[in-house]
């Protein structure tokens, strides 16, 4: 019983010094380490039994060094923990403050951007109102000080000095200089302006001494402060070129008499515009203008540019006619201007009639050659003239040809087949990209600070910058073996795939699930077609998307009714989906093609025959081709795009044959004239027909893609397209791009005009030295797809 009990809630019990064990009979003493400060302030121990215990309780508590150290360590640890909590809270609050500050700054930037857009829209709206008012009433709409909004800074807006009065000399000179600059940019120099004003002045019998300075100032102020700025009028030339050409129709009537042209020149131009052109005569070069006016050939040449004057005037005769105001300006619209200017309408009419008679009496004046003008218009690409009807271009070509033949300039030549170089931008770029492809602002493109003409002139050189780049979007993973064929629904974002696992699957690209660790989306099939007893090798969908056809290694063609794109994948079995079976082939069906014109189906088989079917008939097989295997075993088949009464079939011998579907006779044999001993390398894997041109394209086992003329049967181009066998081809609906797939695991997109590769995509992995089996374009949406031996189908957008 000599040991002491450790007390309190703190440090370990310690043996007391011998002087503390004075109680007789081994009574327990008090340990300062047990109930002292180091012990954590625990309650005192029981009193000792001996009488010596009483004096010990009256002594002060004693502290030990270990107990004190323990207490300090305990308090330090608590302090450190609280400080760590405080620092964490401070960091969280600082992060919260930074986030709120950033959010506030972002909201302020958004507000500034919206205010800027609102001001730009208000400015554009005022301009449109002024243009509409001028077109409808023939007078300028007074909107006060209409100017471009500025966005330098808020301080600049608040402290912006008021502009000078509009009638001040400085504003007048600056406006004249700005107008002259924009006229030079559109190719309308002072010399041409002076010649035209001199001609109109002499026509109307007016002298140079007429005091018209105030009228000139008024017209200039209308140009500067009215509905359109000179910059926008310069842009209007490019935008309304098709309307101007169609209005004046000067190309179609290239060989007509001079009377019609002069009538249009006199009656189609408002007197106010003529006055403005007369006033331009005050600007230098008067001697040169007089010399040029005396030359009748120069006058005739200058008349060719009347459409530029009208377009530069903005609201001239061309726009008035195109908007349905008749072939002449309404005299009621001109009467207020005539009254203000004190113009004698009777004198002008008399002078017009006299001038017409003089023009009828003129003989022997040779019309200027317009070939350069035609070439200039032809050089304008589709980016600058997107809305000119093709008929106008054809008329210009025919007019140019008539004039050239009349002059005996050159003999006729056979033109080579040219592929379209533009026009399919909406498919390749997408509808939203087309709206942004001009300048990125749509209708607000006119409100930029820089010169808009520079953008339009640079567009043809920068076409590649606006070309769409295809990126993988959807991955279709539910097949258990290689995907041999695929086809898009003609309207919906729906895809059908055919696989070696004996099934076809229907996919709705709008029903997606996120893929793991990938930017693409996985799509689950919404329906599985089961009827084949072997691998499915070929596929075709009807033009209305209501039926599809599949050919397999079991020598049958299954005819399916397409389920709804919103079908439930877990619905009960629907027997009506399988519409029928076309039986006739005796070996694997390797190719199918459907024509919606007569609802006919073509199939080619390893039995050596090509068959034409009408599934609606009781005897669906209409005709059989190559029954004697004269050309070999067919590998692929397609309808001729520009002549649906013909079809083209490729064979394993390396040749392709065009057949007449009615007579069953072979019309043209497309041969590349290679050594017949290399038959294995000359094997054609796929043949497609261009949708609009008489051109057939073939994909070969020897890595080549070849182009043939359907009329002559001659090869017009050949190129090494891939690093391995080319297995599949597809032409986009506009006939501008060609897509090819190969066993080198790549998809390549080709420009048919230049025969150059514009994009390469690595899409699939190899399986048994095979990779891509099929590629396809969607006929109405911006989708392309590929099918591979790795049991995957991929869709790109």
Curated annotation (Swiss-Prot):
Positions of modified residues (N-acetylmethionine)? 1
List where in the cell it is found: Cytoplasm; Membrane
Composition bias type Basic and acidic residues, residue spans: 230-241
- Chain positions covered by the region annotation Caveolin-binding: 71-79
Main location group: cytoplasm
Q: Mind naming one GO cellular-component term on file for this protein?
A: Golgi apparatus
From what superkingdom does this record's organism come? Eukaryota
Residue spans of biased composition, Low complexity class: 44-56
- Please report which protein family the annotation says this sequence is part of: Belongs to the WD repeat striatin family.
What function does this protein fulfil?
Calmodulin-binding scaffolding protein which is the center of the striatin-interacting phosphatase and kinase (STRIPAK) complexes. STRIPAK complexes have critical roles in protein (de)phosphorylation and are regulators of multiple signaling pathways including Hippo, MAPK, nuclear receptor and cytoskeleton remodeling. Different types of STRIPAK complexes are involved in a variety of biological processes such as cell growth, differentiation, apoptosis, metabolism and immune regulation.
Q: How does it assemble?
A: Tetramerizes. Part of the core of STRIPAK complexes composed of PP2A catalytic and scaffolding subunits, the striatins (PP2A regulatory subunits), the striatin-associated proteins MOB4, STRIP1 and STRIP2, PDCD10 and members of the STE20 kinases, such as STK24 and STK26. The STRIPAK complex can be extended by adapter proteins such as SLMAP:SIKE1 or CTTNBP2NL. Interacts with CDC42BPB.
Please state what the protein is called. Striatin-3
